[in-house]
């Protein structure tokens, strides 16, 4: 799970973690956890915090070490691809703003992201996401594709 985080996210979480690891022993107490998460833009409820701690606090001592913290943050990040973020991503792909991502727009965006794809690979991506079979990806199809990753 933590292997899905970027190096930048890991560095950010390490900084956040060490910020609240007051005694420098490499662990974060349950009380500190909420503060840490809020500092990196997450906003968990008390119940969510408790659930997250219970999931990773293997020895039940109420503290979390850094690898456990990374795993937990990776889970949380995966769950919070907000609709707003997905809409922004869709709009980034939909260059002409017509509400659909064409093969050309997808190819253009993937090239910008450093992915050199063949026409066949682009067509395959469209086919996988194109539920209604019209040859392009609408917003609903894009959301389904993003949520399944």
UniProtKB/Swiss-Prot annotation:
GO molecular function terms noted in the UniProt entry: calcium ion binding
Residues found modified as N-acetylalanine: 2
InterPro entries: CALM/Myosin/TropC-like, EF-hand-dom_pair, EF_Hand_1_Ca_BS, EF_hand_dom
Family annotation (Gene3D superfamilies): EF-hand (1.10.238.10)
Residues the record lists as binding Ca(2+) 3: 94, 96, 98, 105
Keyword Methyltransferase included in the entry's annotation: no
Annotated protein name in UniProt: Calmodulin
Organism: Achlya klebsiana
């Amino acid at each position: 799970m933590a292997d899905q985080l970027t190096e930048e996210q890991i560095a950010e979480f390490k900084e956040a973690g060490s910020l609240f690891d007051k005694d420098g022993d490499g662990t974060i107490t349950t009380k500190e956890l909420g503060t840490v998460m809020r500092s990196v833009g997450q906003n968990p409820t008390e119940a969510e915090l408790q659930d997250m701690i219970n999931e990773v606090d293997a020895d039940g001592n109420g503290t979390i070490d850094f690898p456990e913290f990374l795993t937990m943050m990776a889970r949380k990040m995966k769950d919070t691809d907000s609709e707003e973020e997905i809409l922004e991503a869709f709009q980034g792909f939909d260059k002409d703003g017509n509400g659909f991502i064409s093969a050309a727009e997808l190819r253009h965006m993937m090239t910008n992201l450093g992915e050199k794809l063949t026409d066949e690979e682009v067509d395959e991506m469209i086919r996988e996401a194109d539920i209604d079979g019209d040859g392009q990806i609408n917003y609903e199809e894009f959301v389904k594709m993003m949520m399944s990753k």
